[in-house]
Amino acid sequence: MKKWTIDDSRELYNINGWGTSYFGVNDKGDMYVTPCKDNVQIDLRDVMDELQLRDVTPPVLLRFPDILDNRIEKTSSCFKKAAEEYNYKGENFIVYPIKVNQMQPVVEEIISHGRKFNLGLECGSKPELHAVIAVQCQSDSIIVCNGYKDQSYIELALLAQKMGKRIFIVVEKMNEIELIAAAAKKLGVRPNIGIRIKLASSGSGKWQESGGDASKFGLRSSELLQALQTLDEKSLHDCVRLIHFHIGSQITKIRRIQTALREAANFYVQLHKLGYNIDFVDCGGGLGVDYDGTRSSSSESSVNYSIQEYVNDCVYTFVDASDKNEIPHPNLITESGRSLSAHHSVLIIDVLETTSLPQMREEFEPTENDHQLVKDLYEIWDNLSPRTMLENWHDAEQIRDEALDLFSHGIVDLRTRAEIESMYWSVCREVNAMAKSMKHMPDELRGLDKMLADKYFCNFSLFQSLPDAWAIDQLFPIVPIQRLDERPTRNATLQDITCDSDGKIANFVTNRQASHVLPVHTIKKNEEYYLGVFLVGAYQEILGDMHNLFGDTNAVHISVKDNTYHIDQIFDGETVEEVLDYVQYDPKKLVRQLEIWVTKSVKSGKITLEEGKEFLSNYRSGLYGYTYLE
C-alpha cells in the first residue's frame, strides 16, 4: 500500500473543487484558510490551539470578514468586465439581502467594505426594514423593500426616502398599491415603486418552486396590467421605476437563468413600449454556490457555471434586448446573498467519542456446545470468497434474522445472540471489502458502507448550527482540520448531542461525489480531533433553532493584518441562563426554588451541608456556562 500524502487528502475530500481559492491543506496536514489575495494562510489547527488558551471551546463559528470583502470585489469585478465586453451603459448595484445572514457583525462588514462599490441592502420584513434603514448610511446606496407590507412598513420606508434614503418599495401583491398610494399622498412623497413579476420560467434545484406559476410572490401578466392601470389612476405612472423577478435560490443550471433573463428582458421592453420609463431591473437571487465542488447541474449542491458566466448572461441579455428595441440599458440589481456570504464562515466541532459495530473476537472458534446457528455462521465467515460472497451474505442475513426471532421467543440466550451479531457484522465487513474491489458492485451491497460506519459523536447541535443539513439534506463540505497527512482508516457518520434521532449527518462531499460516510481517523487518547464544516455563512446562523435548548455557539472574527492572522473579536455563545430565559424561565427564581429544596434536604438529613453547598454551586455555575459540553 502506497504512503498516504496530502494530495490524497485533497482528492479524497475534493478540497480543490469546493475550496476555490480560500481553503486548502498545508505541509503539516492541517486545513488552512486564505481570506485575502495576498495568500496569507491561516492554519485552522493553530487558531483552535490559540482559542483553547483563551478558554474558547468548541463548537465555535469562525468568521473571516476578509472573505466577505473578497466576494464583494469579485462580483463587482465580474460586472465591470461584462460591462466592458458588452458595451453596457447602465450601472450595476450589488444588493445584499440581509435574510441570508442578519448577524450585525456580518452586515456591518458588508456595508463597510461595500461602500466603495455602492453596495445596497434588501429587506423582506418589518424588523429587517428597521435594521436596514438604521445601518445603511450611504445616501446613494439602494435599499430594496420586499416581502409582505402593512401601512406602518410603507410609511416608515417612505419617510426614510423623504429624508434622503434611496428606497424602492416592490409591489408583491395587488393590495399593496392602495397602501403605497395612500401613504405617499399622506406624506407628500413620490415613491420609487418596483413591481415583482411572476415569470413562467423557474429555477432548478431545491428551491425551483420559488419561481414559475407556483411561486409565492409576484404579479402575473394580467395582474401586472391591472396594477399599472391602478397606478395610473393614482397619478403614480412616473413612480414605476423598477421590475423585479426571482426564480429561486441556488439555481444549479445556467440554462434556467438564461431562459428567465430572456423572459424578464421582454417584460422590460414591453413596459417601455407602454410608456413606463423603467430604469432598474432587479434580477433577484439565485447565483449558486458549488458546495460539493463538482461544477455539475445534476447535483442540487452544485452549479454548472461561474460568477462571471452568470454576470455575463445578465448584462448581455438586457443589452441585447435594449439595443434591438432602441431603449436605454437598465441599471441592473443583483441580490446574490448566498454567493457573497457562504464561504466566510467555518464551523469547528470536536469529536467527543466514537462507537463501532461489534466484530468477532480474533481467537473465537465455536465449540460443540454452541448453538447450531453459531456454527453455521462461522462456517460462512470461514469460507467467504469473492465468487460466492453474495450468496454468503444472503445466508448470513437469514441466520441473523432467524437468531433474532428465536431470541424474541426465548429459545436463544443472550450470549448466543451476541456471538451471532458479532459474526454477522464481521461477515458484512469482509463482503463489503470484496465488493469494493469489484468492477460492478451488486446494487444490494451498495448500502453496506453506511451500515458499517462508525458513529462519531460531535459537540454540536445540527438543528442550531446546520439546520439545512437536517431540513433539506443540504451538503456541506466536512473535513478533519488536522492529520490530513495520514490515511483515514475509519468511515463514520456524525451524530450531534441532541436527544433526537434526526440529529445526524450521513451525506458528505468526497471524491467529487456525495457519500453516506465520511473518511476519518482513529481518535487518539488525550488529543482533540476537530472537524471543520465549511461554506456555512449563508442562512445557517439565522435559521438555527434551540432544539434541546442548545443555543448559539461561540463565534470568532479573524482577519489578516501584517502577514499574519489576528483574532479581532470573540462573541461568547449563549449560556444556559440565556436560553432558559428565551423559553420564559426566570433563572433567579429557579435558583431560589432550589435553595429552598436543598435547605429542606439538609435539614432532613438527606445530604450534608457541604453537599448542599456543592450542589448549589454547581447549579449556579452551570446556569452561567455554555450550553454545549465543555
Where are these regions (language model features)?
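Short, glycine-/Ser/Thr-/acidic-enriched flexible segments
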Residues: 30, 38, 67, 101-103, ...
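Conserved, well-structured core domains of diverse proteins
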Residues: 1-57, 559, 566, 576-579, ...
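Active-site-proximal beta-alpha core segment in soluble small-molecule metabolic enzymes
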Residues: 87-282, 289-293, 304-309, 317
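Helical (often loop-to-helix) elements that flank the catalytic cores of nucleotide-handling enzymes
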Residues: 299-314, 363
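Charged (often Lys/Glu-rich) extended helix/loop segments that serve as interaction or gating elements
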Residues: 313, 319-630
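Flexible, glycine/charged-enriched surface loops at secondary-structure junctions
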Residues: 58, 62, 84-89, 274-278, ...
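A non-catalytic, amphipathic alpha-helix used as a structural packing/dimerization or gating element
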Residues: 66-74, 226, 263, 313
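Low-complexity, highly charged intrinsically disordered N-terminal segments
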Residues: 25-102
